[in-house]
Amino acid sequence: GAAEYGNKLNLTFDEMDSVITQGKELGIYLYMFTGGEPLVRKEDIIKLCKKHSDCAFLAYTNGTLVDEKLCEQMVEVGNFYLAISLEGFEAVNDLRRGNGVYGKVMHAMELLKQYGLIFGTSICYTSKNIETVTSDEFVDLMVEKGCRYAFYFHYMPVGNDAAVELLPTPEQREEIFHRIRKFRQTKAIFSMDFQNDAQFVGGCIAGGRRYLHINAKGDVEPCVFIHYSNANIHDCSLLDALKSPLFQAYHDNQPFNDNMLRPCPMLENPDKLGEMVKESKAVNTDYQSPETPEHLKEKAAPYAENWTPTAEKLWNEEKEKIEAKKNA
């Protein structure tokens, strides 16, 4: 899938339409919108859903713009799904997302459920909220509200102003590894952990292996969290972007680690990203506050080092389980 994104979501309808048209020729039928807030462009998104009825579209949203009209349009098109961002219960959520947002999210979920629509939640877990968002109470509430899936994202220390203290500890990450696996067996919701479930997709899927990201300016990036690029959709085709030096470097280096609990070239293998950026001469795409790969590595390296022993232990246990199943 490809994703389009930006603070002002300022790719035009025609530009997004062109990306999808080109994508379909390459076999891409899943498109995601992130933000900013993609639902400020809901009319354009619905138009894209109608025009490309053979594709599935998903928006990551704060949920505040969900109303009856949108629900009716979603029922009509049948190929648009939502992942509503939550950080926890009301007090924690509104601290990050603004007063009153939690109440609006609950209302949005009630509306979507009433219309029989498929939706879920998107949760960024940090050292501060990890206990809450993996509690039975929280997950049970999501099930009750009608969520069919929960996408758990590990906090990424991207950007010059990133707060490294929000990175989960090895103990916390080990705990969420076990809890989400338990939820998949016991809760009526499909839970995915984007950092701890790499074993099911053979490691990092970015850089065009199974996924890429296009920002608001049209820069084609390997991943929503990796702000480096050699290609822009205004200057080249999607296929050319997939052949760009940084994407080729991803292709040549994946998987970045044989340990599937250390999949990322930034977070768990921080040397890798710098090497690929240097080798591909990719430029930084964060125009407001460009960050060097060296600065990013400084933040990720201590985390990677601390996580490695736990990752090795857990991955060895997983491999034993896989072997046991094979031999059963």
Regions found by a protein language model. Give the residues of each.
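Flexible mid-to-C-terminal extensions adjoining Fe-S/redox cofactors in radical SAM and related proteins
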Residues: 225-328
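Canonical Radical SAM [4Fe-4S] cluster-binding loop centered on the CxxxCxxC motif
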Residues: 1-13
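Radical SAM/AdoMet-radical enzyme domain recognition
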Residues: 13-34, 41-153
